[in-house]
């Protein structure tokens, strides 16, 4: 089985870490995967990649294309010979226009649509939609007291890791700051911006900080929450995406409203927990490790490829 992953290559890393890790998890269990990064933004930027794209799929015989995010999915659908599976991650469907496009034009043309939480599946309401969150590399994100990277955390302060960089509006840093300001009157806190760290450093951070704080306005199935769970890190988060489902029943993890006082109160409760959680056990029980998710993805591929082959035979 040979799969072509199609995705935007415009970020600083050229590929989102969770897409890279999904590819690696498929490679680890014997699937042949190639990457196609779309370079350029906007309609003209995407269209400028079409010649290279058609050359790629002409030179190699692919059984299936797996595209991530709506614009890459639309791009992959410019060809009609190879079946396409598309993964929507949530952020790509927040605008009314993209949601309308996905529901009425994109998903009907896909062989299968993957979404990362139940809310998305209910809203899209299509028999082609399945729920399949991205998995976590539990061999990298593992409870570990020994630091392998030089993080230079201030051990005299309570260290709280914010879920993203402060500039992204959907991450709602202002709410986090308001809550921290309320607590600073009584506790010496250090709020760490999740920016510029490599994957090993993120794992070390989640093992060394006192808790992870997420105050997002919206999410799909946030990887950082699952990575924190894999490291047994206490968590405080707003009720976005599938976070409530993920954290349900995990002591030391708390869901908060968008009220700064409530966020501050939940932070205090998480700090008073004074220990590590059993988030890793919950994560694994949900089957959200990379290997387990990779096996589910392969079943999706096999179903699509088999159905496509049958249609070709019956169409003769």
Task: Please place each PLM-identified region on the residue numbering.
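Aromatic "clamp/platform" in nucleotide-sugar-dependent glycosyltransferases that forms part
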Residues: 217
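Acidic anion/phosphate-binding donor-loop and adjacent secondary structure
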Residues: 96-97, 136-152, 308
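A charged, aromatic-enriched C-terminal amphipathic alpha-helix characteristic of glycosyltransferases
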Residues: 272-310
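Conserved acidic donor-binding segment of nucleotide-sugar-dependent glycosyltransferases
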Residues: 249-260, 268-273
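Conserved donor-binding/catalytic core segment of Leloir-type glycosyltransferases
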Residues: 4, 152-171, 177-181
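Short His-centered aromatic/hydrophobic patch
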Residues: 67-72, 88
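Short hydrophobic beta-strand element within catalytic cores of glycosyltransferases
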Residues: 234-237
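Donor nucleotide-sugar binding/catalytic pocket of nucleotide-sugar-dependent glycosyltransferases
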Residues: 108-144
């Amino acid at each position: 089985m040979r799969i072509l992953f199609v995705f935007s290559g415009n970020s600083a890393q050229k590929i989102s870490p969770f897409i890279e890790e999904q590819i690696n998890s498929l490679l680890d269990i014997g699937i042949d995967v190639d990457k196609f990064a779309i370079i350029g933004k906007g309609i003209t930027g995407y269209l400028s990649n079409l010649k290279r794209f058609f050359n790629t799929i002409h030179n190699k015989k692919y059984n299936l294309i797996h595209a991530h995010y709506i614009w890459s999915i639309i791009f992959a659908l410019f060809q009609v010979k190879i079946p396409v599976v598309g993964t929507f991650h949530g952020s790509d469907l927040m605008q009314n226009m993209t949601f309308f496009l996905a529901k009425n034009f994109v998903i009907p043309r896909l062989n299968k649509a993957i979404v990362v939480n139940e809310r998305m599946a209910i809203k899209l309401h299509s028999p082609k939609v399945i729920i399949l969150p991205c998995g976590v590399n539990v061999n990298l994100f593992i409870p570990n007291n020994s630091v392998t990277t030089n993080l230079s955390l201030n051990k005299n302060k309570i260290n709280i890791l914010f879920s993203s960089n402060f500039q992204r509006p959907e991450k709602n840093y202002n709410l986090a700051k308001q809550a921290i300001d309320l607590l600073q009157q009584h506790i010496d806190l250090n709020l760490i911006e999740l920016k510029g760290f490599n994957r090993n450093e993120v794992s070390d951070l989640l093992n060394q900080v006192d808790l992870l704080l997420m105050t997002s306005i919206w999410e799909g199935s946030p990887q950082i929450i699952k990575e924190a769970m894999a490291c047994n890190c206490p968590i405080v988060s707003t009720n976005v995406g599938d976070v409530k489902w993920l954290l349900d029943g995990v002591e030391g993890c708390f869901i908060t409203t968008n009220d700064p006082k409530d966020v501050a109160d939940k932070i205090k409760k998480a700090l008073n927990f004074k220990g590590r959680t059993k988030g890793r056990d919950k994560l694994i029980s949900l089957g959200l490790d990379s290997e387990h998710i990779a096996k589910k993805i392969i079943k999706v591929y096999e179903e699509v490829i088999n159905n496509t082959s049958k249609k070709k035979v019956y169409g003769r």
